[in-house]
């Protein structure tokens, strides 16, 4: 068993998650069984109650874990499913230790940060390694080395280095200030100094910068950080994140890591990277472009736009576009400031979300798509709003609404799941939604059925997608919606919950209560996203 810790220096948001995912990809291409863990030093037990603009998208695992968005990057790069155990938080560690103390499992000892908290961290890491039968485990430590909350995790990493085969990869920012015109290495030197003060010497430094570093700067980092120059790896600005594994391989990073771990190369078969490179090159080309709008409420943060709230939706669009030979131009539309100046946009996606903010803007967008034959894909909340819009403007139920938006609506076409009522009443919000993968039975002959069949994902008319919601289409309104032309393409196996809807005689008007973006990757696009993008090209 071998472990690779990925740490960060200088500033957060450098792309440690993409670095970790890229290393996973290239090591898997060498024939190794790999997996990854994300450590988040916040005190929340999981990411389920975090605001998307606070910490990015909540990634939902197959078994229903609400985790950090970086697990999404890991899954997309290795094309494998992870679990909630792959996301460790300070809250989760302390919760477990306190539970054990209350049960008397420490046999009366004084419970301390060292060894009890550090042992719990190491045990969580080792348990994931054992459960997945992995040969190499990557552990990304969120934040930066200088964060107070990271100290205990770095101490656990230091201890593990004495017990197992461990490599340390440090990701550092090397700025090139416009007025100075040269890369500055001093911040990297300082972050490595902090790391060494904690007993950790990095084996590799990934230099995140605007462009590749020259030999002069690499020599300087090598000297002051006591690291071989060949282990200083370039991570320049790139057009698509899927290019990074290829950039790392050009620098022989996988071979260097395996040598450091005293592991032999299992294979030189890079066929999967060839296909990866082909799809990546499509996303970089300038000629064949499709313009797609994503309407959301978690886009703005202060005076800036941050797409991380919908990162999986954005990536799923890219996967489908690459499969079809196109590069997407994504237009982010703030639903609280909607302007229906959309003629140049070839298709619209309304992703998931919660609450009442920006709802009317999304409803106006759906009306525009339905009436103007603009391809539309609704996800989770997107399905619910598509139903509300249809009920109001086609079925004549002018006050139709969701009880999440208006508790007193006379026509609750969207209502809370029965099993969720007491949960909400008692304010038990964490990890209590309809979470994880669920089956749906598809109706033969529908667009949805044909798309899943095209990708060979149907067995006995059943498909599986991940979910995260409390509200559903109210069964009392099934008949009036269907009588007015809405097609229910898929139900839960018991026939109670509508999982997919579509409109006939429309270029593409499809919505799902699920989150198909969570099962999409560069080599295997989501059928719904594929169908949506394909319709945008017609």
Predicted features along the sequence, with ranges:
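Short, contiguous acidic/charged loop-to-helix segments that flank catalytic cores in large enzymes
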Residues: 301-304, 353-358, 464-468, 517-524
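C-terminal cap of thioredoxin/glutaredoxin-like
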Residues: 164-166, 507, 525, 529-533
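Short FAD-binding loop at a beta-strand-to-alpha-helix junction that anchors the flavin cofactor
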Residues: 508-514
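Pocket-forming structural segment of enzyme catalytic cores
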Residues: 70-79, 336-337, 388-499, 535-537
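Flexible phosphate-sensing "switch/lid" loops adjacent to ATP/NTP-binding sites
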Residues: 1-328, 336-347, 355, 361-368, ...
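Cysteine-nucleophile active-site neighborhood
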Residues: 11-17, 21-25, 29, 317, ...
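Active-site beta-strand termini and strand-to-loop segments that position acidic
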Residues: 501-506
């Amino acid at each position: 068993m071998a472990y690779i810790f990925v740490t960060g220096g200088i500033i957060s948001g450098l792309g440690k998650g993409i670095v970790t995912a890229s290393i996973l990809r290239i090591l898997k291409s060498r024939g190794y069984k790999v997996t990854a863990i994300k450590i988040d030093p916040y005190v929340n037990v999981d990411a389920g109650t975090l605001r998307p603009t606070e910490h990015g998208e909540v990634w939902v695992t197959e078994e229903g874990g609400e985790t950090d968005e970086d697990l999404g990057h890991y899954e997309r790069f290795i094309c494998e499913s992870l679990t909630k155990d792959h996301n460790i938080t300070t809250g989760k560690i302390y919760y477990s230790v306190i539970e054990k103390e209350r049960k008397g499992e420490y046999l009366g000892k004084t419970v301390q940060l060292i060894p009890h908290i550090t042992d719990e961290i190491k045990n969580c890491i080792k348990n994931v390694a054992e459960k997945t039968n992995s040969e190499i485990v990557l552990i990304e430590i969120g934040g930066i080395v200088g964060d107070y909350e990271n100290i205990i995790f770095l101490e656990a990493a230091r201890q593990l280095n004495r017990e197992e085969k461990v490599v340390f990869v440090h990701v550092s920012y090397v700025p090139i200030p416009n007025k100075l015109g040269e890369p500055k290495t001093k911040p990297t030197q300082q972050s490595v100094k902090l790391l060494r003060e904690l007993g950790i010497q990095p084996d590799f430094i990934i230099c995140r910068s605007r462009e590749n570093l020259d030999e002069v700067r690499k020599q300087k980092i090598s000297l002051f950080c006591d690291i071989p120059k060949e282990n200083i790896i370039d991570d320049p600005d790139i057009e698509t994140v899927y290019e990074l594994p290829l950039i790392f391989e050009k620098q022989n990073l996988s071979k260097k890591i395996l040598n450091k771990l005293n592991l032999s190369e299992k294979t030189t078969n890079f066929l999967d990277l060839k296909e990866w490179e082909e799809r990546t090159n499509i996303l970089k080309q300038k000629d064949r472009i499709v313009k797609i709008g994503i309407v959301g409420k978690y886009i703005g943060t202060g005076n800036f736009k941050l797409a991380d709230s919908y990162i999986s939706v954005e990536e799923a669009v890219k996967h489908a576009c690459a499969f079809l030979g196109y590069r997407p131009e994504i237009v982010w539309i703030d639903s609280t400031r909607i302007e229906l100046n959309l003629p140049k946009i070839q298709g619209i996606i309304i992703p998931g979300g919660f609450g009442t903010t920006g709802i009317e803007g999304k409803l106006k967008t759906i009306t525009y798509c339905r009436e103007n034959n603009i391809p539309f894909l609704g996800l989770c909340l997107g399905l619910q709003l598509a139903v509300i819009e249809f009920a109001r403007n086609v079925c004549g139920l002018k006050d139709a609404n969701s009880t999440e938006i208006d508790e007193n609506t006379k026509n609750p076409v969207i209502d809370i799941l029965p099993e969720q009522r007491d949960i909400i009443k008692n304010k038990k919000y964490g990890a209590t939604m309809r979470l994880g993968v669920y089956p749906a039975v598809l109706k033969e002959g529908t667009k949805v059925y044909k798309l899943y069949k095209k990708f060979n994902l149907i067995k006995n008319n059943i498909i599986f997608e991940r979910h995260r919601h409390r509200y559903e289409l109210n069964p009392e309104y099934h008949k009036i919606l269907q009588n007015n032309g809405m097609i229910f393409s898929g139900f839960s196996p018991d026939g109670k919950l509508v999982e997919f809807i579509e409109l006939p005689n429309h270029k593409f008007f499809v919505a799902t209560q699920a989150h198909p973006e969570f099962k999409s990757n560069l080599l295997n696009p989501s059928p719904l996203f594929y169908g949506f993008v394909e319709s945008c090209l017609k």
